[in-house]
Every structure is written in C-alpha cells, then in structure tokens.
Amino acid sequence: MSKIESLSERAELRFWGWGYADEHLSAQEDQLVEAMVSVMAPNNTEIAPPSIDDFDLPPPRLELPEVLTAFVSTTKYDRLVHSYGKSYPDIVRMFLHQIDNPPDWVAFPKTEQQISELLAYASKNNIAVIPFGGGTSVCGGVESDIGKDYQASVSLDLEYFNLSLIHI
C-alpha cells in the first residue's frame, strides 16, 4: 500500500468506513456491507470497497491562503476522510461514490495559536468551521452541507489536541 498524502500523523484510516486502511474485512463484514448497500443501491450495483482514485471531488471553493498552508490540507484523501462520519448512510454513500459536499479544506492545527488563526480567517471570510474529533460521528455532525450561507467549509481535525490539561 502506498503512503497517502495527508497532514495527519495517525495511521491511515479507511475513508469509506470504520477501521484502518491496511485492515481487511472479514467474510461476515463483506456480507454485511453487501446487504447494507443493496438496500440503497439501484439495480444490484456491484459492491466493492472504493478507492481514492474512484472519486472526482470538486476543487475547493476558495484558494488556501499562505498563512494557513502549514496546517491546512486540500488533498483528496483528507477531504474524503472528513466528508462523512461512519453511520450506515455515510458508508453506503461512500460505496456509491456520492460525495456531494466534501470540505474545501481540512485543518490539522497543533497549537492554540493555529486554531485562533483559522477561526479568525474563517470568521472574516464567511467560512463554516466543522469540528472533527475521531471521525466516528453517526449523526451527520461532520458533514459539510453548508448550503449557500457560507463561501466555503473547513473541517477542523482535533487529532493533535488529545490531552486534558487541568489548571488549578
């Protein structure tokens, strides 16, 4: 498996479902996926785990400003991982290649200052910011369906904010 292009340092996640990219589905999981997708797929659509190359995402709606390039990604992999959560409909839409609203950018800040810079830029430029924790949302909370109220969307991945600090 070739190394994907990402600003994330975590093990490569499956962009289309639960788990890591180097893990294979069991026979039972394969059957479950086929059953899930067949409910929503028209005309017995062939079921196969999607590949990054299967997707043609629209370009980001705004150009990434220089001030954010150190920690904000526009790679296809990062945008796919952050397009949906891991609910049944999310996984089925990935298998059917239905990515209607991928985030324009994906931020991986490592400092509070970077979060502040991102939020200030987003506020000033009418960009929706969508928090992303571990990527296990099953209620649509990470989806970038922002309508026409915003110019663009950024998924704010909190991967590097994994410590609880208590100030006494």
Regions found by a protein language model. Name each.
Residues 1-166:
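Noncatalytic alpha-helical scaffold of FAD-dependent oxidoreductases
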